[in-house]
Structures are given as C-alpha cells and as structure tokens.
C-alpha cells in the first residue's frame, strides 16, 4: 500500500508536466507500474491514485447500484473525469488540460500527499482551503482522533 505524505510547491510547464516529488515517488508501489489515474477531487483539486490503489476503488465502484440516481451521478462524474497518466523518464506526470482548468492550476502547483493518493492544488486555493475553517487544527484533531 502507498502512504503519501508531505506538501511541496513545484512549477508546472505549459504542457501540464510536473515533477512527482522524490519523497512521494518512493511511496509508489511497484504494483502501480508508474501509472496513475487522475480525476476530479471533491474539493477544487486534482487527485491522482497509483494504479494499484485505483483498482481497490474500481471494486467499490462496481458494487454501486447503477439504478440509484446518486450512485449513477457519482459514477458518471468520477469516471468521465478519469484519465490514465504515466510517470515519464524525468519523473513527471502530465496533467490533462481539463483537470488543470477545473483546479485553476497554471505556473505553480501545490502537491499534497493524502495516504493512498496525491492531490494537485492551485497554491492560492490550497491556502484559502486551509484558512477557511472556523475550527482550529487542534480542535479538529481532538474531534477526529479522539473518537
């Protein structure tokens, strides 16, 4: 299993290519074959799952009821936005234009490790997200981890 953590801000070129941080590359399982599935995040970001991690989600997707309106909507959205990308010889991934436009990413990108996947954010949006909570980190940590 992958375990991505940390945060880096990198440049992204006009072709959508960005380096995968070295510390995150080390967490990619050999089972992923240097392949990610990128899709739209639930916040205004792009998420990238190593192929082996994505396979576990595919099993969950297959178990959803395609006759249920919410299940069907979710499946259409996540699968329509899903693209396969590979880590190239220079340790970069190319993020599709539609994803970059959705997340408002150009020039710089903040890359965040999120256990089984990596998130790509517009740096300003990420800062807004972090600052947009009414509760402090300590309060949220006590609620989440104190269960």
Name each model-derived stretch.
Residues 1-9, 14-17, 23-85, 89-90, ...:
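Flexible "stalk/tail and boundary" regions
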